[in-house]
């Protein structure tokens, strides 16, 4: 059984922070639960960040497993399912993925493709709730934020591996004149396969249509955090039977990255091709977030900016 009190007005959970909500009076630690209170709690924050690392679920509720944030807005459920465009899509709230209604301490969500779910709502603290699925006995931890204080950039860099997977391929669009000649000069397309640590690369000519790209190499890749440098990531491409390449990864915008090849001191720019929107379509349900296991690399930035 859950040890936390079911909803219990969630300690008012910020309901007093906005004037458009009715004040909830707490008498000691008991509140008469009602659908109105449940809805007020869900709407008390603009966004709920789905903290996968703190959740005890592994794909049990698909639409929560794939979402970075969810929002509850007057009967409509919105979600940010993509890192590309996060903070911009739907004025920061994401896309419409279904509808919801509230019962006593329960939210019924009718997802456009995942169907109907009745999830129990539990209070963790003033800014955190837990959605519990009694069928699978799994839970998702949601942390509440207003748009004005939500750090979209932090979420972006914390989930940058999903960003790489949100394009069908990355096409090389620039190579610096500075830098030693190396074999990576010949590789013009990269693909990071969703749901795995697999990458593929191609030496096909730039501007080759994606449907015609032939993948010449493949292997495994790994992203690393860098101590004391939140926006710098390092990337290792480990080719099957062919050694590896090591890069510093820089994000220019939602569709452009730079790879700094440390060994040769060459800068490559890649542009994303074929954006994959993890929206509402059944074909996209394969994308699921996992608990982060990314390691921290004890290195310093090598590129001279």
Outline where the language-model segments fall.
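Lipid interaction determinants
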Residues: 21-97, 104-220, 224-305
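Sec-dependent N-terminal signal peptides
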Residues: 6-12
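C-terminal motif of bacterial Sec signal peptides marking the signal peptidase cleavage site
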Residues: 16-19
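Long, hydrophobic/aromatic-enriched structural stretches that serve as scaffold segments
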Residues: 4, 102-105
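Positively charged n-region of N-terminal signal peptides that target proteins for export
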Residues: 1-5, 22
